[in-house]
Design a protein with these regions (language model features):
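Autoinhibitory N-terminal propeptides
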Residues: 1-74, 79-130, 140, 237
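Active-site glycine-centered loops adjacent to acidic/histidine catalytic or metal-binding residues
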Residues: 145, 305, 513
């Protein structure tokens, strides 16, 4: 049976096929289509799942740069002219393009029941009859983020030496060792230190995350404050303001590999995500994260994002004879963007698009592959995709590309016309709020299933945010469940509003977002692995077992009567209650 449908390889994800069909001018005006493509070199960076050996792949594609990852995944950079050759190899099982990632930008420690189990607290006598006295010693806390202010006292021991075991700066393609970091700290001033270790956290995001998970200093001490830190500063190989999923996959491969080499348990923190995908855990990024989480003594914690009130999701059910009209407001000076529509493949319906001026595309019936539709001021690329070997979901992707600089502002309408309905559920997602004008949104948005990818990965411990001052769900926090209701996400919530933590450049600051809820759970996971693995109480306390203990220990919040629910999962983090009886 042919691997081609309408001349397109079924091994390539829908968005990649559409990107390859687009002209360079169209890609240039579409952030989603251009991601992964270098216009200067005419090369693509792609994610593949494969079998066999990398050497065999390299032999068949000598012009390609192949970066093997664990578990049969790899990142490939190759000329556009060879993408079809890559898809034609029997070793290659599936191909995706990278996606852009966005950051998910003390009373809280007391509120999460962490203080009773931390070393140095008077109440730290025992946990359900077992000695606690935990600080994270003997564990690794991995921060994959924007870097870290290694000069900050939160990340230095009492003698001034570094707590950072290794720092991989992907932008510099340089790994700094503990010894190099200590030499930099011995230089005295920041200016002299940066002459030795040049890595800086420009945004401060990673420093703030690390301070919550593992900060050491003073009144704002973090959770696993004696754990060793393993830090990756995500790179941006092209002129992007945010990293991509390919950098994240390389970072995961590195930190999990180092932890296994050093035979240390590791809690990995991921405080970013994106909205592109079916939100059912089946993308290559999500399955790769699952494979990493299944490695021994590893727990991966992911924030659910800040799209809860972003009005970037619309969901509903189609019924025969009842078309649905979805209203999409586009703000002034909005550049090109894409709209994803996901449904089950067994349902069949057509699409009609109306511009703010009332012009219609006419009814667009299913036709696999790319279709070009032209307005006076925009071009719309529409792509009816196929289900993949990993998901029954079908994507209809709409990319609005301005002929000038901006999309026509005003009220756009997307009409869904049922033709054959067996299930009827549909979901539409816009890009992350940080990529859009504030006025660009669905008018009748659906707040559920607004969690970002990869928090939809089944093996991740997915964390939303609540306000510990009001004991209420934080309305910005990405909600579950995953699409079609499974898996149940988030598993739990942690404080994410006005959290005091380390500031890049020195001192402390208040931060808000699920970015800063996730590290409460990351630090807690490190403490649990110290108790279980390092202290010898349970050598298997990691991954899904650790997740189960956290879920069982989660406490209820006022106003939340049914658990699990889409807002807070099974409840709020309570570490003291999460240890086994």
């Amino acid at each position: 049976m042919s691997e081609l449908v309408n001349g397109k390889s079924q091994k390539k994800e829908n968005l990649l096929n559409l990107s390859l069909d687009a002209t360079e001018a169209e890609r240039e005006k579409s952030p989603a289509l251009q991601m992964g493509y270098d216009q200067n070199t005419k090369r693509w960076e792609l994610i593949i799942q494969y079998n066999g050996t990398v050497e065999k792949l390299q032999e068949q594609l000598p012009q390609a740069e192949i970066y093997p990852l664990s578990g049969g995944y790899a990142i490939v950079r190759l000329p556009e002219s060879q993408v079809d050759d890559l898809a034609g190899l029997s070793q290659v099982e599936y191909i995706e393009k990278p996606k852009r990632l966005y950051f998910e930008v003390n009373r809280a420690i007391r509120d999460t029941c962490i203080a009773p189990v931390q070393s140095g607290n008077q109440v730290s006598q025992n946990v359900y009859g077992r000695d606690a006295d935990l600080s994270g010693r003997g564990t690794l806390t991995a921060i994959i983020d924007s870097g870290i202010d290694y000069f900050h006292p939160d990340f230095r021991n009492a003698d001034g030496t570094t707590r950072i075991a290794a720092l991989w700066d992907q932008e510099q393609n340089r790994i700094y060792t503990r010894e190099e970091l200590n030499r930099a700290l011995e230089a005295g001033s920041r200016e002299r230190a940066y002459e030795i270790v040049q890595s800086r956290d420009v945004s401060g995001h990673g420093t703030a995350v690390a301070g919550i998970a593992a900060g050491l200093d003073g009144a704002y001490r973090g959770i696993a404050y004696e754990s060793d830190l393993l830090v990756v500063k995500l790179g941006t190989p092209l002129a992007d303001s945010f990293p991509r999923t390919t950098e994240l996959m390389r970072a995961l491969d590195y930190v999990v590999g180092i932890a296994q080499e050093w035979r240390m348990p590791v809690a990995v923190n991921l405080s970013f995500g994106n909205t592109y995908g079916s939100h059912d855990g089946t993308s290559l990024l999500e399955t790769y994260l699952n494979s990493m989480a299944e490695r021994g003594r590893t727990s991966i914690i992911v924030g659910t994002g800040n799209e809860g009130y972003g009005m970037g999701h619309r969901a509903g059910f189609l019924q025969m004879g009842r078309p649905v009209e979805i209203e999409l407001a586009v703000g002034e000076y909005q550049t090109g963007f894409g709209v994803q529509l996901w449904k089950l493949y067994q349902d069949r319906f057509s699409v009609e698009i109306f511009s703010p001026g009332g012009s219609s595309t006419g009814v667009i019936r299913e036709s696999l592959g790319a279709q070009r539709l032209s307005y006076e001021t925009e071009e719309i690329l529409l792509y009816y995709g196929m289900p993949s070997p990993y998901s029954q979901a079908q994507e209809i992707y709409l990319d609005l590309i301005p002929k000038g600089s901006y999309i026509q502002d005003g009220l756009w309408k997307i009409r869904l016309i049922p033709e054959e309905i067996r299930d009827g559920q549909y979901d539409l997602w816009l890009p992350a709020g940080m990529a859009l004008n504030r006025e660009t949104r669905f008018l009748a948005a659906s707040p559920d299933t607004t969690l970002t990818i990869p928090s939809t990965a089944s093996r991740a411990i997915s964390v939303g945010a609540y306000d510990d001052a009001t004991q209420a769900y934080a309305d910005f926090s990405g909600r579950g469940f995953a699409r079609l209701g499974h898996p149940i996400k988030p598993e739990l919530v942690a404080p994410g509003v006005n959290i005091i933590t380390a500031r890049a450049g020195g001192g402390y600051e208040a931060v808000t977002g699920t970015s800063f809820a996730a590290p409460f759970v990351t630090g807690s996971a490190a403490l649990m692995m110290q108790w279980g693995i390092v202290n010898g109480n349970d050598p298997y306390l990691y991954g899904e077992k650790l997740k189960a203990y956290l879920i069982r220990g989660a406490r209820s919040l006022p106003g939340e009567t049914v658990y699990p629910n889409e807002r807070v999962g099974y409840g709020a983090l309570c570490l003291e209650r999460s240890f086994p009886l």
